A protein has these predicted regions:
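Short beta-strand->loop
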Residues: 94-110
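Short, well-ordered beta-strand elements
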Residues: 22-37, 57-61, 162
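Short, polar/charged alpha-helical segment
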Residues: 15, 37-53
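Short helix-initiation/N-cap motifs at beta->coil->alpha
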Residues: 53-70, 154
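A ligand-binding cleft/hinge motif common to bilobed small-molecule-binding domains
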Residues: 74-99
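An extracytoplasmic/periplasmic, membrane-proximal ligand-sensing/linker region
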Residues: 139-170
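N-terminal export leaders
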Residues: 1-2
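A bilobed periplasmic-binding-protein/Venus flytrap-type ligand-binding module shared by bacterial periplasmic
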Residues: 107-126
Length: 170
């Protein structure tokens, strides 16, 4: 009987629908062990649900910053909210991310102590719209969304928004 159960337990994507679901929903990864992160991510999902409903945002949670880093670096997730220090450590391969070299990481917006991060291959048009929506509706957020700064580069779509350029067409 164990042999029968084993394949279904080992396969985390048994029906192969997870990539399809990710394509049609913006899954924003939150950090379970950071209370402020959870509140911020919940507010971001709420603002996007009301003002950018086509994004179909949903909160998903990871145990800690390390898990978020692994999910982003291995292309299992596209966007997350992390502490700014953790995002910098991931980008620079510093502990607890010392084994994750050249992590593909960009910032869409900064919330002060936290940042909304994504992979560089995240569509520029989508990053632009997220930055635009979150900065325009700061009243719904515990901290205002501002232009990225620091070691981790801004995503090119967010950079275009904050530079006052046209929305990218990718």
């Amino acid at each position: 009987m164990l042999a029968v159960l084993r394949p279904s337990l080992a396969d985390l994507n048994p029906d192969r629908m997870w990539p399809v679901y990710r394509r049609y929903h913006l899954l924003i990864v939150s950090q379970r062990d950071d209370e402020h992160n959870g509140a911020l991510t919940t507010a971001v999902v709420d603002v996007l649900s009301r003002h950018l409903p086509a994004s179909r945002p949903q909160l998903v949670s990871a145990a800690d910053a390390r898990r978020i880093g692994v999910l982003i670096a291995t292309n299992q997730q596209d966007v997350a909210i992390m502490q700014a220090d953790s995002a910098e450590a991931l980008f620079l391969a510093r502990p607890p991310f010392a084994d994750i070299h050249e992590a593909p990481l960009r910032i869409i917006v900064s919330f002060g102590s936290h940042v909304f991060v994504c992979r560089p291959d995240f569509m520029a048009r989508h990053a632009y719209l997220l930055a635009q929506t979150l900065t325009a509706h700061a009243e719904g957020l515990p901290a205002a969304a501002t232009a990225p700064s620091g070691v981790v580069p801004a995503h090119r779509g967010a950079q275009a928004f904050f530079a006052g350029e046209e929305i990218p067409d990718d």
